[in-house]
């Protein structure tokens, strides 16, 4: 079979949908902790969101990611798998072969996937965060107002994903959809290296030599551990990205990545860049486990294989 395979894109779409459903509630908590105020620690944030917004508050802004992140993950996994396969085959000079992967192949393929992910995922992440951050504590802090109850007739800045897109384009231009993209690039390029590479090596390490491929249990465990590692280490730049993207809900106070880092450090110290690291790592495990398991099982079904095959 040639190096380019569409099955990877289809399997990535299914895995992406599974990861959104599993991970969005904790993603909401993570975003509120990083870009909002008045939430304290993780458990305090969960209690505040539930008390003020009920269970629906944890799923705020999920419709757009569910429709779009599935496509986003489809592209990321498709690009990674096909790039890695292309590099491995041409390194050995056998385009139709299945040569062993090297660390350099995985590293370069992960970096390519990280760059591509920003072009497609930047607007998706921005809209998700803008919808998640339509909360009273966040608005009061950014407008310098004392905390008060929301008036019944008071409307949020965005009425939904479509209204959010049109409002951003109207007020900030097309470039507004890519606010925080530079921080996202600094997060995702190393982040995907620490996502795909640990997964590949962990799944191979867990799998007995007699097996032709990792079992679903091995995929779930390796995927979850890779997600926890990747999201945990990506937290500092994830904080900067979230703040830059949430900044435009009511006003813009950051001029760019360096200004956001400087202001955040001056006001809240070094610890601010590790805000949400616990929920990031905890959320990263089930979300990535669902992502890789959905990807591998659907790829197995599409190809008619009897063993799961790593990307």
Curated annotation (Swiss-Prot):
It comes from the Eukaryota. Solcar repeats lie at residues 3-86, 101-205, 214-301. The keyword S-adenosyl-L-methionine does not apply. The keyword Metal-binding does not apply. GO terms for molecular function: transmembrane transporter activity. Keywords: Membrane, Mitochondrion, Mitochondrion inner membrane, Repeat, Transmembrane, Transmembrane helix, Transport. It is a multi-pass membrane protein. It is found in: Mitochondrion inner membrane. It holds the Pfam family Mito_carr. Its main location: mitochondrion. InterPro entries: Mit_carrier, Mitochondrial_Carrier, Mitochondrial_sb/sol_carrier, Mt_carrier_dom_sf. One of its GO terms (cellular component) is mitochondrion. Disulfide bonds: none annotated. PROSITE patterns: SOLCAR. Belongs to the mitochondrial carrier (TC 2.A.29) family. This is Solute carrier family 25 member 48. It comes from Homo sapiens (Human).
């Amino acid at each position: 079979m040639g190096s380019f395979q569409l099955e990877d894109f289809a399997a990535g779409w299914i895995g992406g949908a599974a990861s959104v459903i599993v991970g969005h509630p904790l993603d909401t908590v993570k975003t509120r902790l990083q870009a909002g105020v008045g939430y304290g620690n993780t458990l305090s944030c969960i209690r505040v969101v539930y008390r003020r917004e009920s269970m629906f508050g944890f799923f705020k802004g999920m419709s757009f990611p569910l429709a779009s992140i599935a496509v986003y993950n489809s592209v990321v996994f498709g690009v990674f798998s096909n790039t890695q396969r292309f590099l491995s085959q041409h390194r050995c000079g056998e385009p139709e072969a299945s040569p062993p992967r090297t660390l350099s192949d995985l590293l370069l393929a992960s970096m390519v996937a990280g760059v591509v992910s920003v072009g497609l995922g930047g607007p998706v992440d921005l809209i998700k965060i803008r919808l998640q951050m339509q909360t009273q504590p966040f608005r009061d802090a950014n407008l310098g107002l004392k905390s008060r109850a929301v008036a019944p007739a008071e409307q949020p800045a965005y009425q939904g994903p479509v209204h959010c897109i049109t409002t951003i384009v109207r007020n900030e231009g097309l470039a507004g959809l890519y606010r925080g993209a530079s921080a996202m690039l600094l997060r995702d390029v190393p982040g995907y290296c620490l996502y795909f590479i640990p997964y590949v090596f962990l799944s191979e390490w867990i799998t007995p030599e007699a097996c032709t491929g990792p079992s679903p249990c091995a995929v779930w465990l390796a995927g979850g551990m890779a997600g926890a590692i990747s999201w945990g280490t990506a937290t500092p730049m994830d904080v900067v990205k979230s703040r830059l993207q949430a900044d435009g809900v009511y006003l813009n106070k950051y001029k760019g990545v360096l200004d956001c880092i400087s202001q955040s450090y001056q006001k809240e110290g070094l610890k601010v860049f590790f805000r949400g690291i616990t929920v990031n790592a905890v959320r990263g495990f089930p979300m990535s486990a669902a992502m890789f398991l959905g990807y591998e099982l659907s790829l197995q079904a599409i190809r008619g294989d009897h063993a799961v095959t790593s990307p």
